[in-house]
């Protein structure tokens, strides 16, 4: 197994051969050596790796020396991976490798290993194609080396069985044999043996992994302990070294990088070190617990946190590394596959059978338990990510992706290490218990791991093959094949030679055709790498199979013993597995054990079958354990087995056959063997089916990891095991063909199986060649790659399940491709010749890859579009899909087993369907992926349909596969274009990734909304709780006082009665007093803190008093029982003393309580008064701020522009909205108390009836009493910053134009509708605003401004501004801005929710003060009281009373000019301001808006605007108080509307211009809302609103030009003081203005206009006289002053036929 592993390690720079990889990196020139050389070098590397593992165990610094070779690695990655691997293998591995092995702690075994390697060389010469066998042996070697290094580690590795030393010894023997097998392949095998053992040491050496990773990060102890485990641990160790070698890391990294680069190109090199480091950490933790399995699992998880998880045990660990390595390095992939296998076999390697099972189980357990369910998901995500990146890297994705994934994997690994730390202690139990159970948790991780493993097996293993001279794309694809080979290798390592057999056949076929492959691969790097990886993987698998046979013969006994122990540990699952092949979870472990035990002979009989069974033993024991435990472990085993079976039909077949043989032997009782054997002819399809089943099973396992109990046969592990069992059944079906061959003629089985495999491969190859589906299989890989890229583009699709499905799909497709290719290769390799098979496979793979790439590209595009369109549907259908998927999963599981029994194609179809179902299920878990998976099933079907189609597809595919199982088992499944073996899940990969990305975005948005809503609700609840707590605290305090008094009375009475009792009572009282003091002292400090803080103390005090009462009563009773003696003993003096003490204590406690209570009440009242004051001050300040804002927001003034723009944007909305719409948004604009009231009510004080509002305000005052202090402080700050606040609120954004600052009620309604605030009823729309306001209030209370920012949508301005606003801003009413931003930004980018602040604010401040009065009024009762008359006009606002009538609040805060117009404009203000501020907030304007403007828009605008802007008061006012005014205004507006409705037009006429000019006499800076109010006959849109605003801008321009002209004239005339400037009716200036604005003297110019003109003229005079006119924007200050002078426009201007009436 190590041979394949080592090969992949060489190719991928696996951890075991990391040093070798570094050496390889140094040896890119040796690329010529390519695969054959690479294999011998692998053997050497394996030897060296074993040494390195030992040395890694002892030194991790050598890998850093390899790290020096990291830079060569990139070049080699691009260069001939083979040569690089070979060079590294032969050269660097020998040097660094042995050094690394020395580190690994296999030092003791180095000699043995070298001997074994030489033996292996001999065998390798015979079984060069079976390097995987040697790898398996190496795994044992690793155990042996580990045993030599540290028996305790070895034991931990052999966790599954006490045979760890036995495994180590056997491993040594087997490793020796394997090494010889490796050697038999030449130095390649020996090298692989070394690498294998090193990798095994790393993978198995949990301690070693810990040694490498933990050695530096964790502990040398784990290293020493795991050192024995560290043969396989050495593999993990190298993995660890890659990641964690401070010194070893560089080496391991370089090594891994080289390999990974060689294989994945330079991408994995960087990633792999990170991944490897991750492994180190995880491995460190894991190695102790898993004893190599978990260490391997942890190590692999950490080294390829994703890679390891992807391997899910043997497969899981293998897979993630395959994923990360598959992307970037054969080292990773090899480590992935070998370490996966090693991880699987590591433990298995320790005891190939039980060790593999336990290793896989431990891996799965380590993954599941180390990382936990969520951690497993995270790992799965990381692994999926890494796999994506690995495959993307193989497809030419940047290394950064792999690096990112590896970094994520490292992070996960780091956390995994922590988890592994705990798992280290539990890994043995986990290994045994979680072989099945932990596998379920691991399944979730391994599932994605397994998926990754499956994907990476083809990907990583092919990458392992292709990495030697592969480009990233090819590497990725080859990575898929290679991963399968690696998976097979992992299965071989994990289960013994069978995967290696597959690997061997792959490697053998690939070795001869590797160079030819390279020439073809040069033409198509992707196909070339993939095919090369497949072929090399097959060679490795074949060699490994052969070596593993020898090693397995030796290991088999150990594995049998250990797996028997492991199966005993997993007896329930394993026995069930044996009993039920259908219960893959159960069957898996025992099948693995049984297969390892019983099928070792068969497996041995047939090198590949033997290899496959051992992988099943290991992969199935370990991988199946993993599979059952990790879904990917078993999947890894099955994917490894199946993928290996498909990869090298020989190795795959053997592997599958062995898996099936194992499963059959286990399932033989079930009769699946015979059934499996029945479809021997379609064994290739069966293999594909098995692979599909494995993929589907993996997905099922992954799904079962998510819902491992979906089928929960006996337990999560049972369900997983059942899934695995089904996988086993699938494998058995596939393998049963081989198994029949194997079993029927174990020696002959290989050839009959090969014949069947060959037939299948030929059929599949022909199908792949002929059908675009074969191309699509590869195209699916490419598509998957593309999807992976998209996922990378959308990293948010990191949900484990998403990755599980995506990885499963990728692995499925990649594994299916590589397995199919491998099947062809293995069949052709075994039957025809590896080269012929390789050529054929390469041809088919290249063609199919090209086809699949093109077809999948088109499909991916289509699917992406479909997914994009489905994203919403997916989110809706996900739940259904998940349910369906669960059902379908269960069905496919059963169907898979049944169909597997029926025929291999049903297995494929069942698995194919299962995988889509799983994918759907996973996709459901991965919202984005769920759609894609169904989409591949039926690109045009919705998720629900996809899930349904998944079920239908299952049956259809089953029937189709049944009918055409030999031809295109999967052709009929999802997309006909996809390859026969292309799993439906894979088909959905692209869509899944896209859908996952889209769904993730949608999901995140939903989550954000949910979070906002939840935050708002929480805030409301918190406020309510605070109130309740305050009440409770008060009650508790009262009770406490009462209790104290009662207790004191009791004590006094008792003291009189009992003398001694009095002493006791004194003590008790003292205690009570202390408690009371504590309670009182705590309440006192708490008095200054929120009531909730006090509540616990008071409650505690009350409880304490109650307890004291009970205790005192009991003690009193006891004392009373002793009354006679006590009384007699007590003297009067004592009693008096007691009484004095009690009195003093009582007095003190009572006084303290009274003081505390009084202080608290006083404090609260002060707070309330402060709140009221702050509310009033805030209202006043808000009015001032609004005035200032209006001035500042004068469109010419930056602030005005800023404020106006803020209306448009969430940030601008803060202040301009605060000024303009904040009044409507009183809750936010309101003072903290009012805001709290609104927030508390959630309906908003404005939305609530006045009583409710008052109650809420009262509660809010209580709640915000403290807030009020803060808010008053902040208000003071804001008061200081009032003007700045407007600027701050609206970061200076140039108001594009007045139009931009104008927002129509319709716009408001649109915005509100978009924000969900639009509902015509103010309540619903106001709820968001109220929530926002409440949030702001809570932020004020809790200073949770960020929540408000996120929830309120005003995060831009609110976070920084809301603190001041929420407190001071409450008075200032900047708080409301957050709601406005949604409104404003949503509706009009240019239109500001707040009308042009400068234009609108003047009105808002005075006539339109309702805007900021509502803000202030909402929070300010005084302002509301001041504006009660406006409240009459604007009854809809109690707090809006202020807003409705700015004069009161504005009267106090604003100029009298502003307030006087208010009485006149109240109705006008409300129509205008409410319409403007509320966008229909005013009843009359709302009515007009309803009738004239957009009835719904206006209503919703008015309501929503009222809600948002009024703080929901307007809506209530509309509903309640507004009805009164609405009746009045509606009568007016109804009239207007009657005339307006027919006149309702969006065209502005000269009449409107004349009307606007006349309006200029009252308002120079009208807001768009005001303009809309007074042009009810205009259906406002962005254009005409802008036009109106522009008119007023022109009016102002003319006005100011005249002002400046006459001011300069006055200066020239020598006027000394501005007071000398007087404007009379006959003044030239007045005449000019009147002529311009009132040409026909339609109306009498209001007196106030003369005052405004005079003031303006004087301001200009002052500025010119003072020389300020030299300044750039000297007029802005004047504009601000003038903007405050706007007066309410007479109501008759609202008449549509105003001018007609005038004329």
From Swiss-Prot:
Family matches, as InterPro entries: Homeo_prospero_dom, Homeo_prospero_dom_sf, Homeodomain-like_sf, Prospero_homeodomain
Q: Where is the composition biased (Pro residues)?
A: 1374-1384
The record's GO CC annotations read: apical cortex; basal cortex; cell cortex; nucleus; plasma membrane
Query: Where are the compositionally biased (Polar residues) regions?
Result: 66-79, 437-452, 503-521, 608-617, 1208-1217, 1349-1367
Give compartment(s): Nucleus; Cytoplasm, Cell cortex; Cytoplasm
Task: Report a single Gene Ontology molecular function.
Answer: DNA binding
Return the annotated region ranges for Homeo-Prospero.
Answer: 1545-1703
| PTM-bearing positions, type Phosphoserine | 479, 482, 485, 497, 651, 654
Q: Compositional bias of type Basic residues: which residue ranges?
A: 1427-1437
Q: Where is the composition biased (Low complexity)?
A: 36-53, 92-109, 137-188, 196-255, 274-292, 327-337, 346-357, 453-472, 618-642, 927-944, 1055-1076, 1252-1278, 1328-1348, 1438-1451
Prospero-type homeo domain location, by residue? 1545-1603
What are the UniProt keywords, alphabetically?
Cytoplasm, Developmental protein, DNA-binding, Homeobox, Nucleus, Phosphoprotein, Transcription, Transcription regulation
- Region entry Disordered: which residue ranges? 23-292, 322-357, 437-521, 608-692, 732-751, 823-844, 875-951, 1040-1101, 1197-1217, 1245-1389, 1418-1469
Q: Which residues form the Prospero domain?
A: 1604-1703
Q: Which domain of life is it from?
A: Eukaryota
Q: Which cysteines are joined by disulfide bonds?
A: none
Q: Name one GO biological process term.
A: positive regulation of gene expression
Motif: Nuclear localization signal; annotated at: 1291-1298
Record site feature (Interaction with DNA), residues: 1582, 1587, 1590-1591, 1594, 1597, 1676
Renumbered to this chain, the Basic and acidic residues biased-composition regions fall at 110-126, 643-658, 674-691, 1040-1054
Bias (Acidic residues)? 127-136, 875-892
**Functional description taken from the UniProt entry:** Homeodomain protein that controls neuronal identity. As a transcriptional factor, regulates the expression of ftz, eve and en in a subset of neuroblast progeny and modulates the transcriptional activity of other homeodomain proteins such as Dfd. Required for proper neuronal differentiation, axonal outgrowth and pathfinding of most or all neurons and their precursors in central and peripheral nervous systems. Regulates asymmetric stem cell self-renewal together with brat.
PANTHER family recorded for this chain?
Answer: HOMEOBOX PROTEIN PROSPERO (PTHR12198:SF0), HOMEOBOX PROTEIN PROSPERO/PROX-1/CEH-26 (PTHR12198)
| Family that this chain belongs to | Belongs to the Prospero homeodomain family.
Q: What is known of its domains?
A: The Prospero-type homeodomain and the adjacent Prospero domain act as a single structural unit, the Homeo-Prospero domain.
The name of this protein is: Homeobox protein prospero
Gene symbol here is pros
